[in-house]
Amino acid sequence: MQLSTDDILALYGFCQELARSAGAIILQGSKAILEQKGKQDHGVNEKKNAVDLVTEWDVRVEEYVKAKIRENYPAFSFIGEESYSAGEQNPITEIPTFCVDPIDGTTNFVHGFPYACISIGVIYQKSPIIGVVYNPFLDQLYHGLKGHGSYLVSPLHPTPLRLPLSTPGPFRSLSEAQVGVEWGSDRSKQVMEAKSRSYARLAGDGSQKGKVEGGRMIHSLRSLGSAALNFVNVASGGLDIYWEIGCWPWDVCAGVVIAQEAGGLVGGSSETPITGIVDENILTGRKYIVIRGIGDTPEETGLDAQKRLIKEFYETVEDWAPN
């Protein structure tokens, strides 16, 4: 199926409107869950373990989104977190595909921590071209279209602000970085120990005084609890790097577009060449790294700096197979 420029622009607008209307349902769900907190039937269930949560509102939002898509784009394919969990496991094909996480940051949503969002991506010719991430709690809408930039709309800035929010500066070393990481839902001994060692090397003092072997002593580690919000914070410049193993395409698809259009570089596993192209293999590979845009210097282009820092990062952390 071929899409014209006008088709893609209309699709881009549709995704933004859909995210906002779905966001209203998320807010309704948050209110309902917080009112039921402490009761036996509070609408929160477990998937594979006690920290992999799903609520009736995740399902409701996804069903609402699917219905709107069927009504407006019946020929498109659909990949969604809750549909996938229920057995609807559509592959990425040449058919234009919506890739949706109805509530990214469900644990935050359940606890009333206002960092949850809906993430809507569109894959065309097996590559992400549209990304919309909306946090209804903060009324922040991030959106990007391949080749047209990415933007933030918020109550403070009702006119779209181009991302990143400030001119990208140089980035000489990992020691200058604020890095987004997550504990995730796989709490097995192997994964916890690998993450703990990785985080210790990133944050630890590797000097003779600090004695953390391989320590990079970065500025900080941050966990927002949402892959999509980590991606858009790299796009805006609030995070320098985000790295995670274990996410799924619906977690990252929209964020990939928004980050790339802000000058970010997205890659897969440590073995995957960093080309700047996010294809099906990276989207479904469940290992992701994104680094913010970096300004050119007389000594080094921004792209060369991004690749150098990703290499330095992967020399610091450990790898493992996602469950």
What are these regions (language model features)?
Residues 91-162:
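DPxDG-like acidic metal-binding loop motif
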Residues 150-152, 156-160, 186-188, 295-300:
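Short helix-loop capping/hinge motifs at secondary-structure junctions, enriched
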Residues 2-23, 197, 210-323:
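Oxyanion/phosphate-interacting regions
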Residues 1-103, 315-323:
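N-terminal subdomain of lithium-sensitive/metallo-dependent phosphomonoesterases centered on the IMPase/IPPase/PAP
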Residues 168-225:
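Short loop->beta-strand "edge-of-pocket" segments that line small-molecule binding or catalytic clefts
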Residues 130, 178, 240-241:
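Short, Asp-centered acidic motifs that coordinate Mg2+ and/or phosphate
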Residues 157-173:
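Conserved beta-loop-beta connector loops within the AMP-binding
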Residues 22, 26, 58, 69, ...:
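Residue-level signal for inorganic ion chemistry
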